[in-house]
């Protein structure tokens, strides 16, 4: 059992709604790290493996984005990445003031982090994109390639029931589960923090509205989102991480790496999307090394 750093949590009013946050403070703080969870529609819980960094001098901020986890939900028309960027900026100002921070985004949070950096990179010391994306269409195309590589039984079930929208069919659900254990988290026993985030995604409206029924069927409002042509202006030090078997594939990570000059790309062998759990110690070591280098 790992020791959880001293963390404080609460709510801040952001853009008219209450947003839940948790700050794990380092005793001898070297830097501040703000995290953006994925989904869209998950919660911060699955990122709590990063609390290890607080023992190494990094104060870590987590929060549940609008309509996610323990946070309130705005009107549906505000379910956009642009709204999420302004929310992130307001949370950062509320908790950390004008201090420059490192920003880490996981999965969809990586897309949000890129969009934030395009507008607010002057507020950052560095950027960390973990299994993130700059283009939803490219990501969907890559996920379809992964589906094509599944065993025939699962591939056919996804095609057959996906085409008619029968997402609750037991055969379809079995195939989704197989895909997730190959490309989302390659572990038999999933940590309770991950299960909690998935539970919130199922309960709340954001995931279905912005994303769709599952990880590889993106039919929601973000389906056409692509910021690839804008991220070239990002000049802050950028760390891009991706798992060897990541559902947001290495090809997606390579595109981001090619567009951001001051970036490095690290591929975690034998890992998939949630590398922060599959190779927790090494993942946190890499992040700490990057942060300490760019303080």
Swiss-Prot record:
The active site is at residues 107, 246, 273. InterPro entries: AB_hydrolase_1 (IPR000073), AB_hydrolase_fold (IPR029058), AB_hydrolase_sf (IPR050266), Peptidase_S33 (IPR002410), Pro_imino_pep (IPR005945). GO terms for cellular component: membrane. GO terms for molecular function: aminopeptidase activity. Keywords: Aminopeptidase, Hydrolase, Protease. Residues 35-279 form the AB hydrolase-1 domain. Its EC number is 3.4.11.5. GO terms for biological process: proteolysis. Pfam families: Abhydrolase_1. It catalyses: Release of N-terminal proline from a peptide. Cleaves H-Pro-AMC as well as a wide spectrum of amino acid substrates and several peptide substrates without a proline at the N-terminus. In conjunction with the three factors F1, F2 and F3, Tricorn degrades oligopeptides in a sequential manner, yielding free amino acids. Part of the tricorn proteolytic complex. Belongs to the peptidase S33 family. This is Proline iminopeptidase. It comes from Thermoplasma volcanium (strain ATCC 51530 / DSM 4299 / JCM 9571 / NBRC 15438 / GSS1). The gene is pip.
């Amino acid at each position: 059992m790992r020791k959880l750093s001293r963390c404080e949590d609460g709510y801040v009013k952001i853009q008219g709604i209450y947003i839940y946050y948790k700050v794990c403070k380092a005793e001898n703080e070297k830097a501040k790290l703000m995290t953006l969870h994925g989904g869209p529609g998950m919660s911060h819980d699955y990122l709590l493996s990063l609390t290890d960094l607080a023992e190494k001098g990094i104060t870590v901020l987590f929060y549940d984005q609008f309509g996610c986890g323990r946070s309130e939900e705005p009107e549906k028309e505000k379910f956009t990445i642009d709204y999420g960027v302004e929310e992130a900026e307001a949370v950062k100002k509320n908790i950390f003031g004008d201090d420059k921070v490192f920003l880490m985004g996981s999965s969809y949070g990586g897309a949000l982090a890129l969009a934030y950096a395009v507008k607010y990179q002057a507020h950052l010391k560095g950027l960390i994109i973990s299994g993130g994306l700059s283009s939803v269409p490219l990501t969907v195309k890559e996920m379809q390639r992964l589906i094509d590589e599944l065993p025939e039984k699962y591939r056919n079930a996804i095609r057959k029931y996906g085409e008619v929208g029968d997402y609750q069919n037991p055969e379809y659900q079995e195939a989704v589960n197989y895909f997730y254990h190959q490309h989302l988290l390659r572990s038999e026993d999933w940590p309770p923090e991950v299960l909690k985030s998935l539970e919130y995604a199922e309960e709340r409206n954001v995931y279905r509205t912005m994303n769709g029924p599952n990880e590889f069927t993106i039919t929601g409002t973000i389906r056409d989102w692509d910021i690839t042509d804008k991220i070239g202006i990002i000049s802050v030090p950028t760390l891009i991480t991706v798992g060897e078997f990541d559902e947001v594939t290495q090809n997606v990570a390579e595109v981001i790496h090619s567009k951001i000059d001051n970036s490095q790309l690290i591929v975690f062998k034998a890992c998939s999307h949630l590398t922060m759990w599959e190779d927790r110690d090494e993942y946190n070591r890499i992040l700490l090394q990057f942060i300490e280098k760019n303080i």
